[in-house]
Amino acid sequence: MYRLAKTTCLVCMLLMLIPMNASAGIKGKKASRFDWTPVINAIIEVESEGDAKAVDKSGKSCGCMQITPLLVKECNRILDLRKSSKRYSMKDRFSVRKSKEMFLLYQSFYNPKNDVELAIRSWNGGINFTKRGTQKYYRKVMSKMK
């Protein structure tokens, strides 16, 4: 069990070193220069402590970034609007790489100015978040980025 936990932590740490930019899911689209890696890593730490197999109590949010079925559906809608044939499935929520791609796709659509605060708050409270409702989460994520 210890060996499995150690291996899982090592894999998650290695995956966190892969730089991410805001062009996920768009073939032929020039990558944004903004590096979301610190934000993504902090969200992963807050959401699941790096556990790619994490499932919340309700069973709806899954994976290292605790992605909901609604977010998968929204990512597929964005891909459809962009005339992409790529689609995400529910099981993709358990893939660290695909979870990061979904985050980047969501940000590229709803947060084109790469506003870190907007990214963190909307990841927790949805696109219609309230500052009050996301304040605790925002502070947690920001503390992990320092």
Can you name each region flagged by the protein language model?
Residues S32-W36, S58-K60, K113-V116:
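Extracellular/periplasmic catalytic domains that process cell-envelope and extracellular macromolecules
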Residues C9-P19:
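Bacterial N-terminal signal peptides
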Residues F34-D51, I67, F103, L118-G126:
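Short, functionally critical alpha-helical segments immediately adjacent to catalytic or ligand/cofactor-binding
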Residues A22-A24:
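Boundary at the C-terminal end of the N-terminal hydrophobic targeting segment
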Residues M1-C9:
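Bacterial N-terminal signal peptides that target proteins for export
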Residues P69-T130, Q135-K146:
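Alpha-helical segment that forms one wall of the substrate-binding/catalytic cleft
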Residues V39-L81:
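Secreted/periplasmic proteins that engage bacterial cell-wall peptidoglycan
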Residues K27-K30:
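Non-transmembrane "mature" sequence context
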